[in-house]
Amino acid sequence: MDINNVSWSEEMCNLLNIPINRLPEIKNSADEYGETSLFGGKIKISGIAGDQQAALIGQGCFKAGEAKSTYGTGCFMMLNTGPDVKLSKSKLLSTIGYQIDGKVSYALEGSIFMAGASVQWLRDNLEFFPSAPEIENLAKNSNKNSNVSFIPAFTGLGAPYWDPEARGAIFGLSRETTKNDISQALLEAIAFQTKDIFECMSSDGVDLKSLKIDGGMVENKYFNQILADVLNLKILLPDNKEATAKGAAFLASLGSNLSLIHI
């Protein structure tokens, strides 16, 4: 799809030998798409979005300059750039945030491949703790002068490096290093990776004053504070951490002309 004019690209279709008339109609994010009978009855489909676009909507980022960062298996930071495509000079992705009533809002996106999945690695592979939330207490009780650094590049590095061959490493280990110190280093690493994306957005001319966060990791209040300190930015927490589901519900309700008051 050509995001500049929100239509299928004849050039790409010809290159890939795809008949353009076989592709579906491009519609609003909230629209009448049809019905499904997957669950035994007719269910109306009235909203469609990618997961990060849904989270952008669920966090209420409807104005240019508003941004959200979702911390689940990975981390995905997305910035509403308004009605015009903004091409990044810092290797961020230009994409469509949503289209409502024929009006498109574009976005910049940066991805961190491993966030919550790195916490799971400490839990499952190194058996640091029996459940992921326990990393909070370990990190709180770490030696803040341990100088341990963690690079969680288990599956490469995302934005702005885009290096699929990069691999993880832990530096600064000594005989005094504890699992508490390594846990602290991991939370710091996720925050600093977020800062990489934040600085890319800043260099692209965006002056962020705050960042809305969501996802499973935001239950870790200690991580949220690390993030605020590293970014030197106001961090805004949602009433419901599942912003992606909230955004999908918003679009489905809007497309069905239902009340949005309880979403």
Question: What residue spans do the PLM features occupy?
Answer:
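A conserved helix-loop-beta module that forms one wall/lid of the active-site cleft
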Residues: 10-31
